[in-house]
Structures are given as C-alpha cells and as structure tokens.
Amino acid sequence: MMIKQYLQVTKPGIIFGNLISVIGGFLLASKGDIDYPLFLSTLLGVSLVVASGCVFNNYIDRDIDKIMERTKNRVLVKGLIDPKVSLIYASVLGIAGMLLLYVAANALAMMLAVIGFVIYVGVYSLYMKRKSVYGTLIGSLSGAAPPVIGYCAVTGQFDTGALILLLIFSLWQMPHSYAIAIFRFKDYQAANIPVLPVIKGISVTKNHITLYILAFMVATLMLTLSGYAGYKYLVVAAAVSVWWLGMALRGYKATNDSVWARKLFVFSIIAITSLSVMMSVDFNVHSSAVLLTYAG
C-alpha cells in the first residue's frame, strides 16, 4: 500500500501529460534521427523533476487541499505519508532528475528543468497561487518547460523552435487552466484561491479564454511558417485550434457554464496531444536560428 501512496503523491496523471509534450519536443528536434538512450534518459529525467514538483506542491497545499472537494482525499491531507518524509522524497526525486538531465543530455536541459521547477514550486505554489490573479499566467511558464527541455536535450541550444514551443505550450495552459477554474469554481472560492473566474467573474474569463486560444492558434502555425514542422502538422494545428475556438465562442451562449467548461477542458487535452503527435512525425530538416547557446 505504501508504494501506491508514494506514487499517488507524485500525481502520475500530470507526469504522463507532461511526457507526451516532452516526446513531441524531443522528436521534433531529432528530425527522424533518434538517439534512444538520450530519449529514455530525457523522459526519465523530466518525469523525476515533475514528480518532485508535484510532491512539493502537495506538501505546500495541504491546508487548502483539505477544503477543496477535488483534493480532500490526497495522501498528505489524509496523513498517509509523514510531511517531513515527503519533503525528503521530493528532494531526492528532483536532484536525481536534474542530475540525469545534466549527465545524459546537457547543461541547458538541466537549467530549463531547474527554472521550470523554481517557477512551479517557489513562485507559483508558495506565493502566486494564493495571492495573485496572475498565478495561472506564471504557472503556465513552468507547464511549458517539459517540451522545451525535450527539444533542447537534442539541440543543446535555445533557438527559435524552442521559443515557439514555449509560446505554444504557455498559451495552451491558460484556457486549459481557466476551464478547470470555471467547473471547479466553488472549490477555488471555498479555498480562497484568487483565480480569474472567482476574482473577475466567469464572463470576463470567457473573454480571456477566447483571446488566449486566438494567440495559441497563431503560435501553433509559427512552427510550420518558421520551417520546423510540415504541412500535415499545419493542417491538424489549424483544425484543432479552430474547433477549440468554436467551443470557446459557444461558451457565450452556454446555459450551464460548468458543463461547457468541462468540455472545453477535455478538448484542450485532445488538442495538445494532437499537436505533440504531429510535431513528432511531421518535422522539417531546418537550419535553426540560434538565440541562446549553451555547450551541453
């Protein structure tokens, strides 16, 4: 039973979701020439760092998790793992993941993992989530780190492709997270978490969702327009973006915001998975514009 609890506290669903985006970034950069030991090491390294961040987040959020319906049965809330032990566990996971990325990939991949981790645990979980309506925006940067780590593990440099991936996944996080905040509105309100729907209202949030999906649409197309992905990717990116935008616009006429937001949330996962798969298989061999280079 203890193994199950130690697994649950790492939030396996979040790890799996992040792995799909890591694979997308890695295979996009590989352009068909896959280094399998590096591929597996990168997946494991990112998994360990994400798991570490999730355990720290569970530790930090114990007080609010017990208030929220969705989180009241979490392992640390129920006292199934000693909080001090969870901190040691999280630290070991994080250090192992970062060292693996440094040794197996390069310094840039490790540095991106450190930055994503610090933003998620230090800036978002410890402060912004509880204090600011902009918490979601800050958190989106850490959520966009995994595909960029996957990409830079291959290239060893932060180029235009890495920047576009950062934009795509950051912009995707916003409607995805706002949809959760709408259908979990009462939970966030009860826990006094200042998400946009609670602070500004659901109608304002719908406007933000629409604008972010429009920006996401432009960012997804940039991957092909800049020569990184092919036209099959472009067709799928355009199709899922337009469909997602249509769903967002239907929200203005929705009679039940919670049901609408849940559908929008589910489709957001389909959308980002589709893009990750397409960039994995429809890549272009392209000479990258280097913005920032680190020797791996």
Curated annotation (Swiss-Prot):
Pathway where it operates: Porphyrin-containing compound metabolism; heme O biosynthesis; heme O from protoheme: step 1/1
Reactions mediated catalytically: heme b + (2E,6E)-farnesyl diphosphate + H2O = Fe(II)-heme o + diphosphate
Topology in membrane: Multi-pass membrane protein
GO terms of biological process kind: heme O biosynthetic process
One Pfam family, short name: UbiA
Keywords annotated in UniProt: Cell inner membrane, Cell membrane, Heme biosynthesis, Membrane, Transferase, Transmembrane, Transmembrane helix
Annotated function: Converts heme B (protoheme IX) to heme O by substitution of the vinyl group on carbon 2 of heme B porphyrin ring with a hydroxyethyl farnesyl side group.
Family indicated by similarity: Belongs to the UbiA prenyltransferase family. Protoheme IX farnesyltransferase subfamily.
Name assigned to this protein: Protoheme IX farnesyltransferase
Name of the gene: cyoE
